Amino acid sequence: MQTQLFIDGRFVDAVDRGTIDVLNPHDGSLITKIAAASAADVDLAVEAATRAFPKWSALPASERGRLLLRLADAIEANAEELAQLESLDTGHPIRDSRSLDVPRTAACFRYFGGMADKLQGSVIPVETGFLNYVQRAPVGVVGQIVPWNFPLMFTSWKMGPALAAGNTVVLKPSEITPLSTLRIVELMAEVGFPEGVVNIVPGYGHTAGQRLAEHPGVGKIAFTGSTATGRRIVEASQGNLKRVQLELGGKGANIVFDDANLDAAINGAAWAIFHNQGQACIAGSRLVLHERIADEFLERFVSLASSIRVGNPLDPDAEMGPLTSKQHLDRVLTFVNVAREQGGRVLTGGSAPQDSALAKGYYVRPTVIEAKSASDRIAQEEVFGPFVTVLRFGSDEEALAIANSTEYGLGSGLWTRDLSRAHKTASQINAGMCWINCYKRVNPGSPFGGVGKSGYGREMGFEAMHDYTEARSVWVNVDGNVPPHFKR
């Protein structure tokens, strides 16, 4: 298990020898101590990435792609180790780490490995006698900050397109869940990535993250996390006007119309909010039900939520694990009182499970709360836990108004058999993504991101590759003659 910083091709201690405790969310015990990057360590990492950039960006794109493909193979060859590490560190149920986190990580690196030599420029029709073509050039050194909820997948989402496009990387994983990212970079060294191309600096946001965001040698910063921290990233980045990409909070509306397939909608709504204990920016945390089917839906949905097996994430039978930290657990549980104070009804959950084997961990039961109003805090603020807020509507217009009533605009979903209603509603929801008769589907080829206070820029797909490049316009005087403008 690697615990040091990775700078310029080597695992090293922090300059000031600082460390951070990494805790097991199942019982609060110490897993290990990791090196804590300071501003000085970030400076060293940026210097290494700067030195590596000329050769890496000049490497044939097919060679960069080949290394990413080899990394994808290495991830699959070490799949069980990575799954165990991810579940131990984050609390993801091991069945999800095995079936989702690790395969999706490998798939993302493989996708961008194949994409590396397919990033094309263009030729612009201009006046006779001139040729104008546009190249896509890498930004340079990019800083990336990965959150604690899906460290393995988000590492691939960020590094894949950046490296394929020819950039070098300084990435800060969360100090809470850094272990799988450190293992990934170890595999990168093993498959032949050159020194300095990727540098990993786990550390606190107010030190390592702050320095990475403000560093004058970083050409772009890509951040996934809370909206409040995103604002600080933007402020810190202004010194050198670096490009900023933000994937921030969400309060996803999951609308169930009265003609929906209820069996599918109930299963989909449970997946939308309870997968990974609701710790997902795209979680369907607002369940918006047509009043004609609401009672039947809730009876069945609450029954399903109450039956979800909460347990040790390393237990193959566990369907939901702990929240990732004690601090986050305390924050999530405060929303139960907030909801009750505003007239909300707790239909199930709202407390820790009554299981002595889980008493030391950061566990909370799947929770369903019916809000009194769409303006209630529980319906407006991101809880980031297994808490779903139920709201009722009577017309399509009312459903749309509820969906668009928050400051967020990341994920959304709707369930209906009416094709016209589905497409019309999807086009009017103020969100970067909408799922119809499904929820939380992702693919490396499909752009992922939000609008409004959910951020800007996109992960994955061609959009991500473009976000890690600059358009370079080249003009050619075909015949070489230049008529005199200043005649003598």
What is the predicted role of each segment?
Residues 1-27:
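Hydrophobic face of amphipathic alpha-helices that form TPR/SEL1-like repeat modules
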Residues 220, 228-373, 436, 483-487:
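ALDH superfamily catalytic-core signature
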Residues 53, 57, 72-79, 83, ...:
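Structural signal for hydrophobic packing residues in well-ordered secondary-structure cores
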Residues 31-119:
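Glycine-rich loop-to-alpha-helix module at the N-terminal edge of alpha/beta enzyme cores
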Residues 27-33, 218, 255, 309, ...:
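Conserved C-terminal structural/oligomerization subdomain of aldehyde/semialdehyde dehydrogenase
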Residues 120-264, 393:
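Rossmann-like NAD(P) dinucleotide-binding subdomain of oxidoreductase/dehydrogenase enzymes
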Residues 28, 64, 86, 109, ...:
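Residue-level signal for inorganic ion chemistry
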Residues 21, 35, 57-58, 258, ...:
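A structural signal for short, well-ordered beta-strand elements
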